[in-house]
Amino acid sequence: MNIVETILTPILLNISQTDKWQRDFLIELFKTLFSRQGRFNFENLTRYSKYNELTHRRQFSKYLDWLSLNKSFVDFNSGVHIGVIDCSFISKSGKKTFGLDKFWSGVASQAKYGLEISVLACINVTTGKVTFLDATQTPSGLSKKEGSKYSRTDFYLEQILDCLKSLPTIVYYVADGFYAKEKIINGLTSNGKHLITKLRSDANLKYLNEKPRLKGQRGASRKYSGKVDFKKNGISDLSKWILVGLDEKYPHLTIYTQKLYAVNFDRIFGVVLLLNTKTNKYVLLASTDTKLDARLITKYYQLRFQIEFIFRDAKQFMGLNDCQARDENKLDYHFNASLTAVNIARKAIQQDEIYNKSMNNFMRYQYNRKFAETIYYKLSQNDEFDLIQSIWLQAPMWGNLVT
């Protein structure tokens, strides 16, 4: 049995609302996706799959609970997990594709015309292993301004809230500075979750007044004892900050922490200041959980960048940018299938040392196996052909990289 079947069969049997026909199609889809050459689109899939183009189009229109499927790759009992959310730009030309709009491209460092997907993943804090969970395409025409009736911020929050019930053990969600919005913060905290994010370098923050109330003092006590003063070359005064020490992973970073009132959010954050001793520049991280240790806030935010490796593998190996469909449902199916394929491939690489922990070797092995099987089944019709077991076992290893 192919390793893809070994991994997927028990997982798909536990997912509700999937029949045998859909399970068989998914197994064949991922086997084809791993063993193909060229783009991940309907026309090219037909060249390598036993299903025709019409079958692929019909199946891509059907609903599938991708979150339940991908949750099966996570052992939530193996340690603390954090949620990570980020967006990825997808290049797409034309005028009729659903969701076409101007979105930010990190590679180009500017807004470009194309598609965008909002991706939710989880990371094991102990091992640093990241697992894709769910992807949703951002619709076009949504306002970028937070004060609008329904903006992109509302859409991103909606995706997170839809997944919360399925992820009860995840308490902390980590996102970059774009997600430092009042709606997202309030949406998470009202559901018993916390957000760790990045603040602007000139964030409007105030120190809390920790002085005891004087005997016989009239009126209410002062809540705050002054504004945090930021200068162009760094923070001017660190005397009111608590020195935690050097970062374990990056010794040139010094960690300071303090509980501060954020004026724009009207709430108290546990704020971490990371001071780069080489450049004298700093970064501000914030957590809605004011009791969370500063080192953990730093570690969780550093782990956030693991989601970029999912985007890298999906675009480089799994054809994330290759979809030729224009329909909303087909696009959603393609994006989730491409990102789910990364989970399956990593699971296979973890189980078998033959791939040398290399995604490139895994893809090459699957293609070579498919190629060798095709030749064998064609030649096996001839009675004079005998399979040499040693050569057959070596065939899928052609061209593998050695680590």
Report each predicted region and the residues it spans:
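Active-site-proximal, Lys/Arg-enriched surface segment
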Residues: T55, F60-K129, L133, V244-D247, ...
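Electropositive, glycine- and tryptophan-enriched low-complexity nucleic-acid-binding patches
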Residues: N44-R47, G106-I170, V263-L284, K291
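An internal, acidic/charged active-site-proximal segment
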Residues: G141-G270, N356-N360, L401
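Basic, amphipathic alpha-helical segments enriched in Lys/Arg and hydrophobic/aromatic residues
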Residues: D322-Y376
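Electropositive nucleic-acid engagement tracts
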Residues: P10, N14-K95, R222-K227, N360-S380
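Short amphipathic alpha-helical "interface-anchor" segments enriched in bulky aromatics
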Residues: F89, V228, A294-A325
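Short, conserved catalytic/metal-binding motifs centered on acidic residues
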Residues: L45, G79-S93, L120, Y173-A180, ...
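Long, charge-rich low-complexity segments
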Residues: G79-V84, Y377-T403
